[in-house]
Design a protein with these regions (language model features):
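Exposed, low-structure sequence patches enriched in small/polar residues
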Residues: 1-366
Length: 366
C-alpha cells in the first residue's frame, strides 16, 4: 500500500466522555450515568458506513453504554443499538429494599444523536443547531430513545420462593429516512419501534439443591415507518405503516386488511435443575404475526407434532445443560429456535433461527 495515500492519513478527530455518580441512602441506592460520545458525526445515510469513514470509534475501546442490559428474552430482542460514534444520553437507576422480603428496581434511560439532521434543497444532509449536552427527546430527526423499566422481587417461605415481576416501556427512532423543510412546509420519514413488556419469573428451591423455575414474558411490539407532514404550521399528514401482518388468506402476500398495529409475543420457559450439576428446560416462543415466507409443515419437528403446535407462529425446544466442572459448561438443545437480536453491553448480534435441529455449546469461563 501507499503510505502517502489520503485514505491512511485522513484520520477523524473525536472524543468521548463518560461520568458515573453513586449515592447511597439507607436501604436505597441511586446510580446516574452520563455519556457523550462524538468520535464522528455521520449523516443518517452514512451512519453505518465504516469503510469510507476511517478512524472513528474502534471496537477495542468498548466504552460504557448507559442503558439497561435486559435479562429477559423479549426485551433483549428490541434493545437499543448504541451509536458509539455519536450519542449523548444518561441512565438513572434506583434500587433497594422496601422491607426484608421485597426489593425494588427502577431504571430510566434516554439518548439521541448530538444533532438533528435535515435535507437542504439539493437533498444533502445537514446538521441542525449546536451539539447537545443532553438527549433531544422531542426531536425525531435526532433519532431519540427512551426506556423505563421497573421491577419488584419478593422472597418468601424462608427465601425458598422467589417471585420477580417487571414492566418495560420503550420508544426508539432507529432510522431517519427523510427530513425536508421549507418556509411553509416540512416532511419527515423515520423508522420507529415501541415495546411494552411484562416479564414474570417464579422459582422455588427445595432441599438438596433441587429447584424449579417458570418464566412467562408478554410483549406488545410496534415497528414500522412513520410519515409526518406539515403545511403552514398545521399537521396535514401523520401516518404509520406497520411491519407486521397476519396472513389470514394463507397466500404469503401481505394485504392491506391484514396489517397489525402491533405484534404480540409470548415466551414461556419451564425448567428443573439439580445444583450444581444440571438443568433441563422446556421453552415455547410464540407470536401472532406471519413470516414473509411460511415455514411450512415440512419443517415441523418432533416436539411440535407431540404437542400439536402451529409451527408457523411457534418455536419450541428442550435444552439440557450440564456443568462438567466449575468453569466448563455443556449445553444441548433440540427443537426450533426463533433467533433474533441478542445484545450484550451494547454489542448486538443476530442469532440465526432454525425449525428442526440441534445446537451444542461448550462454554469455558476464565
Amino acid at each position: 500500500y501507499d503510505e502517502t495515500n489520503e485514505l491512511f492519513n485522513n484520520y477523524a478527530n473525536g472524543r468521548g466522555l463518560y461520568g458515573n455518580i453513586n449515592v447511597y441512602l439507607n436501604f436505597l441506592s441511586l446510580n446516574i450515568e452520563y455519556i457523550n460520545y462524538r468520535f464522528g458525526t455521520l449523516d443518517p445515510d452514512n451512519r453505518g458506513n465504516f469503510v469510507d469513514n476511517y478512524g472513528l470509534f474502534q471496537p477495542y475501546q468498548n466504552p460504557p453504554i448507559a442503558i439497561n442490559i435486559h435479562e429477559n428474552i423479549l426485551m433483549n430482542r428490541v434493545s437499543h443499538q448504541i451509536n458509539m460514534n455519536n450519542e449523548v444520553g444518561y441512565k438513572i437507576e434506583l434500587m433497594g429494599m422496601i422491607n426484608n422480603w421485597i426489593d425494588i428496581l427502577a431504571i430510566y434511560s434516554a439518548s439521541s444523536q448530538s444533532h438533528s439532521w435535515f435535507m437542504d434543497s439539493n437533498y444533502q444532509w445537514k446538521k441542525e443547531g449546536e451539539a447537545a449536552l443532553f438527549p433531544h427527546s422531542d426531536k425525531k430527526a435526532a433519532t431519540p430513545f427512551q426506556e423505563f423499566y421497573g421491577e419488584l422481587s419478593f422472597y418468601m417461605i424462608d427465601q425458598k420462593l422467589h417471585l420477580k415481576a417487571g414492566y418495560s416501556n420503550s420508544y426508539d427512532v432507529t432510522k431517519l429516512f427523510l427530513n425536508t423543510k421549507t418556509d411553509t412546509s416540512s416532511s419527515m420519514y423515520y423508522d420507529l419501534q415501541k415495546s411494552i413488556a411484562i416479564p414474570l419469573n417464579i422459582s422455588y428451591t427445595f432441599e438438596s439443591g433441587w429447584s424449579i423455575n417458570a418464566r412467562v414474558e408478554t410483549q406488545f411490539y410496534t415497528k414500522g415507518v412513520r410519515q409526518v407532514g406539515t403545511l403552514n404550521g398545521s399537521t396535514v399528514v401523520d401516518t404509520f405503516m406497520s411491519t407486521f401482518y397476519n396472513d389470514k388468506n394463507n397466500n404469503e402476500i401481505p394485504e392491506k386488511n391484514e396489517y397489525l398495529d402491533y405484534e404480540t409475543n409470548n415466551f414461556i420457559s419451564l425448567s428443573i435443575s439439580k445444583s450444581p450439576l444440571w438443568s433441563l428446560a422446556f421453552t415455547l416462543d410464540k407470536t401472532n404475526v406471519s413470516e414473509v415466507i411460511n415455514r411450512g409443515n415440512e419443517f415441523e419437528n418432533t416436539l411440535e407434532k407431540l404437542f400439536n403446535i402451529d409451527q408457523s407462529r411457534n418455536w419450541v425446544n428442550v435444552e439440557f445443560v450440564y456443568n462438567i466442572s466449575s468453569t466448563i459448561r455443556l449445553s444441548l438443545l433440540y427443537g426450533s429456535l426463533k433467533g433474533g437480536l441478542v445484545c450484550t453491553n451494547g454489542i448486538c448480534r443476530i442469532i440465526e433461527p432454525f425449525n428442526d435441529g440441534f445446537k451444542m455449546r461448550l462454554t469455558s469461563m476464565f
